[in-house]
A protein has these predicted regions:
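Structural detector of well-ordered beta-strand residues that form the stable sheet scaffold
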Residues: 33-34, 57-59, 84, 141
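Conserved N-terminal Rossmann-fold NAD(P) cofactor-binding segment
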Residues: 1-2
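Rossmann-fold NAD(P)-binding glycine/threonine-rich loop
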Residues: 12-28, 35-64, 72-75
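Amphipathic alpha-helical transducer elements in NTP-driven molecular machines
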Residues: 66-69, 126
Length: 167
């Protein structure tokens, strides 16, 4: 509500509270920068409708996923090519991580065990890829994404895709 504030950066990682903050900010003509993949992946398209109606911008951030991925997508389009795949290479992913298995790490770094688990079990990357799909109109190739265990050179990943399925 405060005058003199043009934009709000939402970074809580909480869906319900963060969405309430964003909606309230939009109601008061504040631009929004989302650094909260959980909000963007669940209600981001809805928030965009509210922002458009209010004449403000709702945007993701740069410097991390999915912002870096979106920059690559825009670059490829900008040089006249049509991107067929947007993906994210995850160095550590273990679908069996739980808040219990992550409790020690979370305590050591002063973080929430549930949030830390989402970084390791694939939850966070799923939100990030949903955001990219929403923003680009691309489709998620399959429920749960692909998640190949791949240790060769990144250029060889192209052999994993059937071009006709991507078009």
């Amino acid at each position: 509500e405060a005058g003199g504030i043009d934009a709000i950066i939402e970074v809580t990682g909480a869906i319900e509270f963060g969405a309430q903050v964003v909606i309230r900010a939009i109601e008061h003509s504040k631009h929004i920068i989302l650094m909260n993949a959980e909000i963007d992946g669940t209600v981001g398209p809805i928030l965009k409708v509210y922002a458009d109606r209010a004449g403000v911008i709702v945007s993701g951030c740069d410097g991390d996923q999915p912002g870096v991925e979106m920059n690559l997508y825009r670059f490829v389009r900008g040089i006249g090519l049509r991107p067929l795949v947007c993906g994210n290479i995850k160095g550590l992913q273990d679908p069996y991580r739980t808040p219990t298995t992550q409790a020690g790490f979370a305590a050591k770094w002063g973080q929430n065990p549930t949030m830390v688990t989402s970084f390791a079990d694939g939850t966070k990357i799923s939100f990030e890829q949903a955001i990219v799909a929403n923003a680009t109109g691309m489709k998620v190739s399959r429920r749960g994404m692909n998640g190949w265990n791949f240790t060769d050179h990144v250029d060889d990943l192209t052999k994993k895709y059937a071009i006709e399925e991507l078009e």
